Amino acid sequence: LRYALSVRTSLPVADHKLVQIVDAALVEASRKSGDWLVCRKGCTQCCYGPFAISQLDTLRLQKGLSDLRSSDPKRAVRVRQRAQQAIKRLSANFPGDPKTGILREDEEAEAAFAEFANDEPCPALDPETGACDLYDARPMTCRTFGPPVRSGEEGGLAVCELCYHGATEQQIAKCEMVPDPDNLEERLIAEAEKQTGKHGNTIVAFCLAG
């Protein structure tokens, strides 16, 4: 199987800086959170259900898979096979273009995506170990999920439902993660879209299946 998103383009150089900034913010949020943040290897609830990823995330994941082919070819093949199998299951009801993997952005499509395939595991998730096979290349959503992060138009703090049990709203607020204060990601997404000629979001399965 070949998909339009399988075209390989260089990852923007500054993505390394973005990853460092976001990962440092996660370390700081984890320090503040202590035992309230229970994220760990094998805790996979957030690895089920497709979520939107940018073209920058796509390039990072594809580079990660390319690196995995060099270091562990058999594991890389399994990741790709899981992605291809996922697309077979998901294409019929995909709220976007199943040929390109690009999600539609209209209200109807967004509503459909909110309820789309919530039990579908991420292709990068190793079903035997519960670990991410592309952890170092994971999307920004994965890097910021868990700690308190502002989201939505109202900018409320969102946390993983498994975390911060027993913490007050004030205590949670003090653990807030500010992942990208200078909006570097937005600029790099624009660069990635210009390089790839692809505009809009996709899901992990489409970017790893090619």
What is each PLM-predicted segment?
Residues 1-210:
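Short loop/turn segments that flank or connect secondary-structure elements
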